[in-house]
Amino acid sequence: MEKQTLNKLDKKITIPKVVKRILENSLLGLDFATDIILPSTLEYFTPYAIMEIGRKRDNESDKYPKTSINLHIENSDNFTAINGALYTKDMKTLLYMPNKIKGGIVPISNETEIIGEGSCSYINGAYPDFAIKANFPKSVKKICKNAFFGADICLLKILSDVEIEKTAFANSKINGLVINMETVPSEVFTDCEEFYRIKFCEGVKRIEKNAFKLGTITNIYISPNTEVDSDFIDMSDKMYIKKHFGTCSFDDLDNPDRNKMTLEEAKKELTIGGEKNSSAHNYAIKNDIRFIEVENDIDKIDEFLKGYHQESKFEFAEEIPF
């Protein structure tokens, strides 16, 4: 489908039956659409057709509807639509998820095996559930590149071995991460600047180079079973994003670097928890990062991740249940 010529102000859009393929950017301009009815004859769909609309609604919410675009299709041999989301006919591949998530949890079908490229880009919470969680069903075997590009997730859990392509969570805002896959691959979390708590469970055997970027990460717990790459946290930048908690000094408003901090400042924000003489302990010593010995006990680990060892806890610490 070439660039659409539909009424850009319509909320409900019906794609003509002559359309067989919906390609990248082909639905640009439908900024006010809330429902798109796809033709039963459709053979190919890419979420990149409407990804830019999700970005605009996420970043310029005062101009556009505060709702998702829901996709609908009936009597199709190739696709199934459920609650606005689009899957392949057999439900095994998620192709598109409406970006305003209701109920606080990303509703991925228990039949899904593949979370497709770009399928969950720019997802975030819909009022009143602004803080959303992503827990993948055991059926999920693969998360494709850019699947969660630009997503805003309070807590992400990856508790089984899943094939994750590079940049799967690129540019996402993820406050808390619990991960238990055998190998955490490099560049999966490229440019994620809003991590605060990360928990590597006992199932994690290795964390590869540049798996994470230094910045707003506050507490990382690493299991004694885990071997970390010498560069598993990317420290290649000279400046890093500074975390804010809803306050800003007026004295800083004219300072172009008010939202940034140096490498040394960023390292001071980070605490690694684990067992003495572990790979994590050695990494912390080598990189001059604060290390706290934490017993391999669920309650002790959770206390550490919530910042009880610090002089002042962050206000939202209790809101990220590990």
Model-found features: residue ranges?
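Structural signature of tandem-repeat unit edges
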Residues: M1, N7-R21, L30-Y44, G54-I114, ...
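Short, aromatic/basic amphipathic alpha-helical patches
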Residues: Y48-G54, M235-S236, S279-D288
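Short polybasic/polar patches that bind polyanions
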Residues: F149, A170, I285
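BRCT (BRCA1 C-terminal) phosphopeptide-binding modules in DNA damage response/checkpoint, repair
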Residues: A280-Y283, N287-G307
